[in-house]
Amino acid sequence: MSEDGAQTAEKMDTHTQYYLESLIIDALKGKGFQKIIELFDGKVIFSSQFHNKLLLSQLDKLINKELDRNEFKHVSVLMKCIQHFCKNDCQESSTLIHQGLVSKMVLWFERTVDFLRISKEATLLTLVEDFYDSALVICKCNCEDGKRQLLDSFLIRLGHLVTEKWVACHLRLEALRTINCILDSISREDKKKLHCSEDLCELTKDLARTIQEAGDYDIQVAISEALCRMMGKKFRDSFVHQWFEDNFLADAFKEIKDKEFETDCRKFLNCLNSRHQSNKGVYTFPCITVFTDLDELKKPQDENMENFWIDFNAGSQCVSFYIHNTEGSLWDSVRLLKESVNNYTLKENDGQQMLGIYLKDPQVINTNDVTKVKIYFEPKHDIKSAIKRVFEDINEIHSNPVELDSTEGLIDIGNSLASHTVITTATTFKQWKRNQANKMDSASDILGSQTSEHSSTTKTSSANRSVQKSLSNADSHEIVIESVPLEAVITIADEQPNTAQFQDDMDDAIFQGAASDVPAKDSSQEIIIITEASADKEFAAKKTQGIFQFQGYSDTLASDQVSDAKKKILLPKQSTERATPASRYRASMNSPLQRTSSAYRSHLFCESNEVTSNTESERSWIQDFKNKSAVKSADYSCEKTRNKSKRKVLPLASESGDDEKQVDTTETVARFTSRKEMHRPEDINPKSPHSAELKLPGISALLTPGDSRSQSKSDYRYQSAIDDQDIMDPVEEASSPEMSIDHNKEPKNGHDEVYASGPLNRSVDGNNIYHAADTLQHATGKRKHKTCEREEIPFKPRKLFSSTEKNVNRSAADSEDSEDVFYSESHDQDLAEASVLSAFDSFTKELKRKFLTRYKRIENRANHVLKSSHQQVSTVLNEIHQCRLQKINHFNKIVVHELSSLEAEVQALKQFEKETLDFWEDQYVKMNTFCSSQTQRIKTMDSALLETISNLKNVIQKTTKEEVSNTEEHIQNKLLK
């Protein structure tokens, strides 16, 4: 390759690795989410994705922006992007976590919960579930800091969500399962510190109170498990009296043993529910037996499980019970929700109460599609009150659902048979049992011959299409009936119905008519075409004869019964899951992140190292994604014990990190041998263009659901080989044989691969043709894992990977693109390489163990120092706070006292001012009076003075005149002398 070509390839590879981040930036700029949605829908395939340090801030802005716009679907897509980054590479996830991903998630989750208070949109419910998935992805990353952050912040928020009564039941249950998964993933040291957290102690009290108010048995079990995980046995005994004020309940909770959690928890919850008669939320009764259609269900096989318990949950409005799983050691759960029930009957016969529940759509129970469940109780139990509390709005049928008016087998389903009639042969269940073998052979031959003719019609039919809808099509001259057995259907113009006496229970008449000639499960299936009646008169005459009239029984129920037989006989096997937008249980064929139903809980302590198959039943909702080890971590579920002597009790909460499973050399050799056998040249088309495509690892595992029950034996072999690998590794996933085979096998009918969000089924004939299941699963439907899925290898940091192991993985990926090189390797070379890999694997794990031991010592020392510093700082801050409070209180008292003194002085001054004004007013009056009198006096004195002066003048003048005269006389006298 030239230098320019190498540079161009390097640029293209860099662009591909950062493609998802570029789409997020484009969405932030307002260019939409369509390309990201197509990426996660599987329409675009790319290699491993990376990001820069600015991604978290960009995601924060974009998520808050979309939440402000109420675009919850876009936020779900962004959460899937976060899951992919965390799942794709441990280094990438550590970068996001160290930047504060968990704290951002808590803020986003709180905003989402606030929206959930005022809206119940399906996209909003899905977003809440995506937060659960993101938390699980972080748990599976090999980042202890992320787990610790989840434990400190996100787990508390989930616990508060569980205690809220307004939250939907399935969201609360999924939140509890997420809490238990988080608690199961943390180390033993972190578990020992849980009882020291005040927030967690308060949360345990709230959860214990919620147990008594939940109204659903599964929620009660999940809360009990969470309490047992949060508090060890010795701390549990000290906290239990704070959780339960009733000493009887507290003592009953103490009796729960970790190794017998399921049965002991059943005893405790039965005791708790029986003591709340006034406000009872869960009614629990032992039943005699349970039947689904014609099959009997068995109680879980446990020597401590004495009765077959049926729970009537008033809070979640469902009937639930656990049954024995015939193909695994786990328990299967059956939940009959109110929304999926059409009606029910309750009657007493032969000293037994029979509760019949009729479903709207078929539900998968023990790998069978079921539309009717019959539960038998002893007459002493008050079943009527319990069922009315659960199905309060559903009418009870007091008469038989099906009444036989004559000996004919004519079925009238409402008004949908206005111009068409279906006649079934009158046969009893015993007759069917005697003739089953002969009829099965003939039916298989006929159906097999018709499969090729009507294959296109079969593919377009859906599992939930009712007979009533098919019969009401007046434009067609042919009726496509997919639910009536082949030998039970005849044309009206050719044959008259036979007469027979039905000896069985009238409640089973519908199922005998619809399934009287049920062929074997693996036999060929096809559609039967019945021609229209040629004469209306003949039809009217025959209609008046023996008719099954559905009195008090809805037309929908009748069509559902026939639809049940339809999927049993004439349709290819459809997916057993019905997904709803609000459902938590969206199944993914390769996803390691699923939380399966609590019914399939593993035992708290795994008592067997046996690898059980989970082909047609759901896996335990507590998933251990680490390698199987001799010592397993605590796992709260009950395991079927076929041989008690082989059971082994292991200690609680053993840390899987210190006890990694040692990979056996022979197992490694077998893996390489099986891989080479599966990669034979004749099985792979080397010219297929799909081999050169880039694939985004982890996306198909998360978002491409599937059902593994219909896989052939060859699929099982190469699937087992793939499951031994770490599916989270991009190199191994890109070179998996399953991916190569799926890309290179072309369907016989030439159809392209169908991308669908719903469950997909692989056809029985081996071709990679997927039929989208139309049947919607209810909100509490179960998540299912693929067949014989092995426990996955935990995520490892890149630094702990052996360089030789990385080179082997890269060479395996390169060999997928160039098949000739891969297939040229000899069997001896594979064995030698397997031995080298095994040796390096042992060396790597020993080195990892030493590193982890040293790291944990350093971490414990650092944690101790940090804890001491934190306590000292907290003490100082507390003292400062108390001092500030004292100063503020003292200052407040002084100010109040001074204000009161000032107010008193102001009042005194006002009084003094008033007195002064009054005094001066009096003085002013007196002064004016005095002045007036003085003025008058002065005037009087003036007049007197003037008079005196005038008198004085007169006197002076007289005197003067006399003196002058005397003087003159004297002078004259002297002169005379």
Swiss-Prot record:
Expressed in immature oocytes (at protein level). Expressed in the ovary. Residues 447-474, 574-593, 642-728, 804-824 are annotated as: Disordered. Keywords: Centromere, Chromosome, Nucleus, Phosphoprotein, Ubl conjugation. It comes from the Eukaryota. One of its GO terms (cellular component) is nucleolus. GO terms for biological process: meiotic nuclear division. Residues 674-693 have a biased composition (Basic and acidic residues). Ubiquitinated and gradually degraded by the proteasome during oocyte maturation. It is found in: Nucleus; Chromosome, Centromere; Nucleus, Nucleolus. Pfam families: SYCP2_ARLD, SYCP2_SLD. Residues 449-462 have a biased composition (Low complexity). Residues 463-474 have a biased composition (Polar residues). Belongs to the SYCP2 family. Oocyte-specific protein that localizes to centromeres at the dictyate stage and regulates the survival of primordial oocytes. This is Synaptonemal complex protein 2-like. The gene is sycp2l.
